């Protein structure tokens, strides 16, 4: 009998909402030269092919910094930088063009592979490169001539859209021409950022050596707002980190996010499958830079009843929560606060006020199993406490059979039945024997 993989089935089912959401959207993928020379690059190419097969419109931007430095070293030349930007003289430009040209051919060849027994079998991907970008010189700064180092003058977004409409992957490198016919060396982060903005891309995706941005404890930060990302850039630059994939991408991601690109994702080029995990799972695997959080705490509406029921039913079946019917939920929905992530209800709690006694009950606290080790319960408690204070309540109580210590750690103390509102005392279930915990607001 063939072995069945329920993990594969569950993973595929969970990815379907993201497949549908991403289809027809434009993504700009930024590949630094470090990613291209890594042994995992073949897998990254396969995953790019997978995205294309799912109907995602792809613009791939590649850099060549380490390859250019190797070429310079082979000619006994030192790279020259001014204010952390490469100075590209005529000799260096030839080496830049050589490195960029070889990478373009290599990436195109890899994406064109459709041999049997390979992930791209039968893909038949068209890869298109061209003069989609017109450059101009950076000029002279503090007496230093950047020579053939340039910046973007304009982008022919209509031409790029035509290629994407014809189901091609657009491949763009770090060399662009000017209106005078000269060639200029551009930074891959500027190219990727400007393309994402001009094409109104849904996402910009970058690769670095780590799995994203980490905090001081070394834990991956799953989500950053532009201001926080800017602070992280400044911290890294203070330690002399100007050219890593993380810093270069974050610079671009901050600009892109502030210019209308909804999400920018930073993932590792060393991790096989990082691109797929980041885009087709609820929590991803790297760091995303966003203007608005993928997760929000808000009051529940009638449309949230299905999600709340799905969340609390397993806890009701285990006897952890008191059973609530759909009809009861419909009548009490205005009492509920939820945490929603990518249209999934991952946590909920209700506040039942007793205004005459200046006290409220926090009830029906539930957190999705995947998020119980995080701070969602704390977020709900803070929100419910805030709501209770706004109502003029002075105390908050809970009835619990399983989470006694959790509430005690947050300022609740054991209490007797007689502290409850009269109405609640009459309904107290002595068979269930829930512990009563009370906190001052």
UniProtKB/Swiss-Prot annotation:
- Domain N-acetyltransferase stretches: 295-434
Per the UniProt record, which EC number(s) apply here?
2.3.1.1
Cellular component annotations (GO), alphabetically ordered:
cytoplasm
Reaction catalyzed: L-glutamate + acetyl-CoA = N-acetyl-L-glutamate + CoA + H(+)
Q: Which family does it belong to?
A: Belongs to the acetyltransferase family. ArgA subfamily.
How does the annotation summarize its subunit structure? Homohexamer.
Q: State what protein this is by name.
A: Amino-acid acetyltransferase
Gene it is expressed from: argA
């Amino acid at each position: 009998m063939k072995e069945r993989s329920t993990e594969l089935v569950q993973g595929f089912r969970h990815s379907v909402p993201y497949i549908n959401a991403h289809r027809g959207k434009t993504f700009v993928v930024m590949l630094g030269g470090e990613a291209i020379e890594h042994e995992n690059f073949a897998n990254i190419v396969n995953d790019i092919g997978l995205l294309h097969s799912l109907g995602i419109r792809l613009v791939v931007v590649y850099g060549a910094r380490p390859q250019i430095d190797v070429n310079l070293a082979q000619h006994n030349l030192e790279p020259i930088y001014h204010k952390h930007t490469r100075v590209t003289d005529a000799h260096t430009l030839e080496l830049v063009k050589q490195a960029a040209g070889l990478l373009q051919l290599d990436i195109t060849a890899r994406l064109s592979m459709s041999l049997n027994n390979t992930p791209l079998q039968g893909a038949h991907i068209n890869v298109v490169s061209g003069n989609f970008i017109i450059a101009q010189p950076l000029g002279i700064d503090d007496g230093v001539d950047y020579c053939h180092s340039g910046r973007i003058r304009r982008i022919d977004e209509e031409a790029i859209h035509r290629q994407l409409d014809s189901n091609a992957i657009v491949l763009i490198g770090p060399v662009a021409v000017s209106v005078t016919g000269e060639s200029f060396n551009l930074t891959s982060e500027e190219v990727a950022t400007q393309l994402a903005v001009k094409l109104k891309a849904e996402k910009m995706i970058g690769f670095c050596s780590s799995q994203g941005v980490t905090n001081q404890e070394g834990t991956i930060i799953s989500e950053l707002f532009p201001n926080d990302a800017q602070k992280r850039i400044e911290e890294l630059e203070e330690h002399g980190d100007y050219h890593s994939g993380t810093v270069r991408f974050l610079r671009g991601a901050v600009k892109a996010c502030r210019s209308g690109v909804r999400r920018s994702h930073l993932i590792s080029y060393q991790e096989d499958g990082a691109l797929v995990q980041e885009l087709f799972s609820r929590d991803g695997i790297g760091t995303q830079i966003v203007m608005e959080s993928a997760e929000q705490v808000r009051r529940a509406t009638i449309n949230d009843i299905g999600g709340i029921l799905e969340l609390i039913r397993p806890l009701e079946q285990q006897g952890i929560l008191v059973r609530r019917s759909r009809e009861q939920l419909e009548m009490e929905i205005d009492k509920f606060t939820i945490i929603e992530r990518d249209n999934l209800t991952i946590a909920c709690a209700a506040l039942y006020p007793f205004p005459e006694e200046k006290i409220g009950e926090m009830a029906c606290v539930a957190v999705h199993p995947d998020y119980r080790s995080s701070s969602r319960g704390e977020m709900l408690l803070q929100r419910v406490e805030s709501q209770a204070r706004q109502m003029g309540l002075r105390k908050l109580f809970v009835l619990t059979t399983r989470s006694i210590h959790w509430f005690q750690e947050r300022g609740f103390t054991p209490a007797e039945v007689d502290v409850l509102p009269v109405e609640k005392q009459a309904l107290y279930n002595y068979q269930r024997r829930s512990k009563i915990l009370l906190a001052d607001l």
